[in-house]
């Protein structure tokens, strides 16, 4: 299988269907549910909405589908998209549906689009303009709901794509509050994407429900993805690279191509949402049916511009645990981009995100809850290492790879061999940096466009391709910024250069530091668990009779804005209809008791992402795949609120005071049972909150805040237990021995001992570069405080 280009072509994986009465946040949607679903049940005047107009579309001919299926068979598995849908050109207007007015003056519009035999239906809006207060929802034949899409989804291009819904029909519903006229809505659908393959085409033989929905990050691609990335650590294990990690994004184009990009700074440092990636991520991997024989042909560029409108950008898709794979939050997404710069001669592409919501000051910007960072850059021809890369290989959670080289060189690079579908020579002369060997980690398919950083954390290139993997971590090629930079600004060919955009005022600089828009008012995740070693400590919550809620005490040392909350879900197989609504609340502690009136609250009843529908060209909200993986969900604040300093109970409870019976992930503090009793609280059914003497574990709920830096991680002032800790980095073992005597020993997996060191109190650093050949080892520590061990690989 050819593995040069590091982009993954996403297929229609197993879609775990959630229920229809679920609010859906994703891309940037405000949640809620369609007005008709609630009003139909309680008012006779809207019964006609059950019989809304249906638009029947002709399915593609058998010859057309046969042609696509035959083409699929001829494509390579690694470099070509998994085609699951074909577009049907349409001219759907609002006049083809039905408007109804409620007794309260609200307007409801519904139109059902049906394509017999389709495995999925997707939409693309060539015109999308929603007035303030309007909400648009989509729901399908299998109970899937997306929305609400609102005026915040309006963009300068006035287009929007919605990811496909399973089944052969989809209903579009628009809700307008009283006082808003239907004439203020402008909606036109020019493409419907007819899914001709079902999720069974990629379903593995063991019938696991771990695959992803169409257009969703694959996470564990074909159930081997996590294993293939076993040598590439979760980025949270390396907090020293947190800024660069904040800048690195997962991209999904046309609902089918998954890759990586990086938010990149410009010399005006104005927060322009530029994203650097690889050209082949947005030109269908130099497909002869897409690109012209002439490089950078204007016709190709126009096609690429259309692809950019379909891109979904995922922020912060990463595991919150160092050692355990948890499917990261998918709720922080933005959709749509415009093409800024593009050059096939270097495989370079620069995009600008267009689907930005409007903040409280009326400015379109990336939300603070996404915690963005704009990476700096270095166009020197002699950058200094050590070099490292951050990526979303295999469309999975964010990973890191590190090389120890101090210098790097330019090489020729070609991808022609084994690519029968190319219509011209695809090679580059002295355009690519080459990483000879990754000392830690690897890239993989899906890492295309990911940034390569120098020793100062500045971007020097983006990944084009290579053949590295965990067993062969060698020779990856990144196009060099210095080669793709371009000379003097010239409006005639600025699209082929980076310089006019990243250095718009033509300043005499070759390096630029990163940009943190929230450095004076940082975004902070309050958590005693985030990034900690939690392997073996996490398990699903065991429901307790008579308990309707659980929480833990947090302390805020300064006034702060609450942006939202994270919660970790364990594995489960309940249908969405069986999942009750939950409230996440922050309640003041007064006189040792939790106030019955929370100061802040948000609702957990949905988990969504945004997807592009190739048939319709629209963006749609999709319910996340929830099932066989531990999953992190981000629940945004309905409105940012200022919270004063003090002690609070951060809790989750059922809305109807029924038993808390849900596979929420729990973990334990590294403290004593007495400390559990001080920090873990429970709510009894029909009663109030009180300290728990029996639970012994805490639900993993974290608060996301913005403001002055908090002292600590929000945990109450309870002494942490004395225990050993250790990690491996850069050829050295770093070991903390809080007190007493201790000995560290290193073994291989067959029990052969390589070294033994007596530890002093405090930090101990043990070099291992010349000591250990490359393989997996066990560090074992024994001493006054007991025993401790970790696995590591030099």
Q: Which residues does each predicted region cover?
A:
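Aromatic- and Gly/Pro-enriched, solvent-exposed loop/edge beta-strand patches characteristic
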Residues: 440-441, 449, 575-673
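C-terminal subregion of chymotrypsin/trypsin-like serine protease catalytic domains
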Residues: 289-305, 323-334, 341-343, 453-525
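Short, surface-exposed beta-strand/strand-loop-strand elements in extracellular ectodomains
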Residues: 130-144, 581-588
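Catalytic nucleophile loop of clan PA
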Residues: 262-272, 441-463
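Protease-domain processing segments flanking chymotrypsin-fold serine proteases, especially trypsin-like
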Residues: 27-108, 157-163, 168-265, 515-546, ...
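Beta-sheet-rich sandwich/jelly-roll-like modules and their strand-loop junctions
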Residues: 515-591, 647, 654-710
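C-terminal outer-membrane/trafficking sorting elements
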Residues: 23-25, 575-588, 716-794
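Serine endopeptidase catalytic core focused on the charge-relay Asp
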Residues: 165-436
């Amino acid at each position: 299988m050819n593995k040069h280009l590091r982009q993954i072509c996403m297929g229609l994986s197993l879609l775990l269907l959630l229920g229809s009465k679920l609010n859906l946040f994703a891309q940037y949607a405000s949640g809620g549910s369609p007005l008709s679903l609630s009003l139909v049940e309680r008012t006779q005047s809207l019964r006609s909405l059950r019989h809304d107009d249906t638009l029947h579309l002709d399915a593609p001919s058998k010859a057309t589908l046969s042609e696509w299926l035959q083409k699929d068979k001829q494509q390579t598995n690694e470099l070509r998209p998994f085609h699951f849908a074909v577009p049907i050109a349409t001219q759907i207007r609002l006049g083809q549906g039905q408007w109804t007015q409620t007794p309260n003056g609200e307007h409801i519009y519904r139109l059902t689009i049906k394509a017999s035999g389709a495995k999925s239906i997707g939409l693309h809006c060539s015109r999308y303009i929603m007035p303030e207060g309007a909400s648009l929802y989509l729901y399908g034949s299998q109970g899937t709901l997306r929305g609400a899409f609102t005026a915040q989804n309006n963009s300068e291009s006035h287009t929007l794509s919605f990811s496909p819904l399973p089944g052969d029909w989809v209903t579009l519903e628009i809700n307008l509050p009283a006082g808003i006229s239907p004439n203020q809505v402008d909606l036109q659908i020019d493409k419907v994407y007819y899914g001709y393959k079902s999720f069974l085409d990629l379903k593995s033989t063991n019938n696991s429900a771990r695959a992803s929905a169409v257009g969703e990050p694959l996470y564990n691609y074909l159930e081997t993805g996590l294993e293939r990335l076993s040598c590439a650590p979760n980025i949270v294990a390396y907090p020293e690279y947190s800024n660069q990690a904040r800048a690195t994004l997962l991209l999904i184009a046309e609902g089918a191509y998954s890759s990586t990009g990086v938010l990149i700074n410009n010399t005006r440092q104005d927060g322009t949402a530029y994203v650097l990636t690889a050209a082949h991520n947005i030109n269908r991997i130099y497909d002869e049916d897409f690109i012209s024989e002439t490089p950078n042909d204007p016709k190709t560029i126009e096609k690429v511009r259309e692809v950019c409108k379909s891109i979904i950008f995922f922020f912060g898709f990463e595991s919150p645990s160092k050692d355990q794979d948890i499917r990261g939050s998918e709720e922080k997404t933005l959709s749509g981009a415009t093409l800024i710069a593009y050059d096939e001669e270097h495989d370079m592409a620069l995009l600008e995100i267009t689907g930005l919501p409007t903040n409280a000051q009326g400015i379109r910007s990336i939300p603070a809850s996404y915690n963005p960072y704009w990476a700096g850059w270095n166009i020197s021809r002699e950058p200094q290492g050590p070099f490292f890369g951050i990526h979303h290989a295999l469309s999975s959670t964010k990973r890191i790879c590190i090389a120890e080289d101090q210098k790097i060189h330019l090489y020729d690079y070609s991808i022609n061999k084994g690519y029968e579908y190319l219509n011209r020579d695809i090679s580059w002369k002295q355009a690519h940096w080459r990483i000879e060997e990754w000392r830690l980690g690897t890239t993989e398919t899906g890492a295309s466009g990911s940034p390569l950083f120098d020793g100062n954390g500045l971007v020097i290139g983006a990944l084009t391709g290579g053949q590295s993997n965990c067993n062969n971590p060698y020779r990856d090629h990144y196009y060099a910024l210095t080669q793709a930079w371009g000379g003097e600004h010239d409006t005639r060919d600025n699209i082929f250069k980076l310089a006019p955009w990243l250095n718009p005022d033509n300043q005499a600089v070759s390096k630029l530091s990163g940009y943190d828009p929230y450095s004076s008012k940082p975004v902070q995740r309050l958590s005693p668990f985030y990034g900690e070693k939690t392997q073996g400590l996490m398990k699903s919550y065991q429901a307790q009779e008579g308990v309707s809620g659980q929480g833990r005490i947090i302390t805020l040392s300064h006034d702060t804005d609450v942006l939202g909350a994270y919660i970790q879900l364990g594995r489960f197989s309940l249908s969405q209809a069986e999942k009750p609504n939950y409230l996440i609340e922050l309640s003041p502690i007064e006189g040792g008791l939790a106030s019955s009136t929370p100061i802040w609250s948000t609702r957990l009843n949905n988990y969504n992402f945004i997807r592009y529908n190739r048939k319709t060209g629209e963006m749609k909200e999709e319910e996340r795949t929830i099932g066989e993986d531990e999953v992190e969900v981000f629940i945004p604040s309905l409105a940012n609120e200022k919270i004063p300093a003090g002690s609070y109970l951060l809790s989750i409870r059922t809305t109807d005071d029924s038993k808390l019976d849900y596979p929420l992930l729990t973990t334990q503090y590294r403290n004593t049972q007495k400390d559990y009793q001080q920090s873990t609280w429970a709510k009894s059914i029909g009663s109030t909150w009180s300290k728990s003497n029996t639970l012994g574990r805490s639900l993993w709920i974290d608060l996301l805040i913005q403001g002055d830096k908090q002292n600590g991680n929000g945990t109450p002032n309870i002494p942490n237990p004395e225990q050993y800790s250790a990690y491996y980095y850069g050829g050295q073992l770093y070991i903390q021995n809080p007190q007493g005597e201790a000995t560290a020993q290193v073994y291989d997996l067959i029990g052969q001992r390589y070294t033994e060191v007596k530890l002093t109190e405090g930090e101990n650093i043990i070099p291992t570069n010349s000591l250990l050949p490359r393989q997996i080892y066990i560090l074992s520590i024994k001493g006054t405080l007991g025993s401790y061990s970790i696995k590591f690989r030099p």
